[in-house]
Amino acid sequence: MLQTLERNVHTFDAQVLTPAGAAALAELTGPAGLPFLPPDRQRTALENGQIIADYAGQPALQAAAALMPLYDDAPLPTSLRAAGYGADGQGAVLTPPVRNENYTQLRHFLRMALRWATERYASYHIWAVQPLTIDDLPSCEDLCAQYLSAGLTLRGLRPMVGTEGMLIFSARGLPHWQEPFRRLHLDDPALSRVLERGYAAADFGWGKQGMELLLRASG
């Protein structure tokens, strides 16, 4: 059976998948599976209750994401540990969601996934990632906006094999926010350097050139 996390028969039906949901998950993701979750780890993730999904009141799954523990030796958690994010192996990282093109509840889904992850890992840190796709910047900006609107904070932009860069988000914000230091676009070459200096983005705006991240420091 599927564990029900939250249910609204009209719009939202978030559930933690078990192995019984493997076929439904495969129908949503196709042969590629969930991003950054190696195919040979999917069965284990289902058995361990590490995949959250939403039917959104439909017969088929509409969205899904995996929560990978940082001690895992898969490429994603390994690269995060190497970059200093959860270097002790405690905590977890939420993979980018796969969703039906008509799915409209992404922000709600992300909030639910973060709440579930935070409860599951208690005091440990929760991260989320998003590949930077310069060649499809509007879609990348839209997903980043959904992440930030769901309560995530952009903390880093790191190189990662197979991507143009990996945006790294934290479920925790800075304790005290100062006034905005700078506004940057996702494709600005200065973004990674500013984030490395300890600045972070939890909010954004829209300008003539697209999404503008408001970079702030902790006071």
Which residues make up each language-model segment?
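Conserved acetyl-CoA-binding loop-helix of GNAT-fold acetyltransferases
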Residues: 91-95, 99-119, 141-142
